[in-house]
UniProtKB/Swiss-Prot annotation:
NAD(+) binds at G15, S21, I22, Q42, D66, V67, M94, K164, I193, K194, T195, L196, A197. One of its GO terms (biological process) is fatty acid elongation. Pathway: Lipid metabolism; fatty acid biosynthesis. The keyword Lipid biosynthesis applies. The active site is at Y147, Y157. The keyword Aminoacyl-tRNA synthetase does not apply. One of its GO terms (molecular function) is enoyl-[acyl-carrier-protein] reductase (NADH) activity. This is Enoyl-[acyl-carrier-protein] reductase [NADH] FabI. Substrate binds at A97. It comes from Rickettsia conorii (strain ATCC VR-613 / Malish 7).
Length: 260
């Protein structure tokens, strides 16, 4: 086992859907660095996928979490308080948009989809952070996942880009609020990665090809790339870093254009 950047730390990992999830890659590396973990799953269907993954790396705590239901959130943190007392880091890894409205024009987004997308993808970070703050007795680190579509228009991203933009603004305000308790809040802006969530994005294979061709490192981002960045942000190595968008996209975001 890799020793210690997170030795003795406890962390809550949300957003695992299967073994291709970015949250799963982050969890694996956090465990290798000594962390004790608590997983969540969104529904009974995902429970069947998440529990075997938890068992695979010796994660003894797995709970249901539906961020659209306040009682589900309070039940989770009551359990954490009872079992752990306190904990050290939180990964906010969930996002949602109606895949049917990721096609076509953003202007045609329905009110229901806009509300659900912003609630699950952004407001849930506030709710989880508020609950986590009360249990991060010795300070802590909160990390969420974002994407370049928050800053620039990406085809077939639509309302999710707006939700990620709101998420990125939120981390700055949360970082300001929670800094007095030595809790850091940051986001990782990862390049496009093939996951269950990304399968809802139209023409995703073209996005991957374009990213690899444009990025200075001439490849696509991997789950492991993001996992390493997350471990850094969870650990004491980043104790002076908060309110930041940390790019893990092989340099794609620095490019103004491709070679002519």
């Amino acid at each position: 086992m890799t020793t210690g950047l997170l030795q003795g730390k406890k962390g809550l990992i949300t957003g695992i859907a299967n073994n291709m999830s970015i949250s799963w890659a982050i969890a694996q590396l956090a465990k290798k660095h000594g962390a004790e973990l608590w997983f969540t799953y969104q529904s009974g269907v995902l429970e069947k996928r998440v529990k075997p993954l938890a068992k695979e790396i010796g994660c003894n705590f797995v709970s249901e979490l539906d961020v659209t239901k306040p009682k589900s959130i309070s039940n989770l943190f009551d359990d954490i308080k009872e079992k752990w007392g306190s904990f050290d880091f939180l990964l906010h890894g969930m996002a949602f948009a109606d895949k049917n409205e990721l096609k076509g024009r953003y202007v045609d987004t329905s009110l229901e989809n806009f509300h659900n997308s912003l609630h699950i993808s952004c407001y849930s970070l506030l709710e989880l952070s508020r609950s986590a703050e009360a249990l991060m007795h010795n300070g802590g680190s909160i990390v969420t996942l974002t994407y370049y579509g928050a800053e620039k228009v990406i085809p077939n991203y639509n309302v999710m880009g707006v939700a990620k933009a709101a998420l990125e603004a939120s981390i700055k305000y949360l970082a300001n609020d929670m800094g007095e308790n030595n809790i850091r809040v940051n986001a990782i802006s990862a390049g496009p990665i093939k996951t269950l969530a990304s399968s809802a994005i139209g023409d995703f294979s073209t996005m991957l090809k374009s990213h690899a061709a444009t990025a200075p490192l001439k490849r696509n981002t991997t789950q492991e790339d993001v996992g390493g960045a997350a471990v850094y942000l969870f650990s004491e190595l980043s104790k002076g870093v908060t309110g930041e968008i940390h790019y893990v996209d092989c340099g794609y975001n620095i490019m103004g254009s491709t070679k002519l």
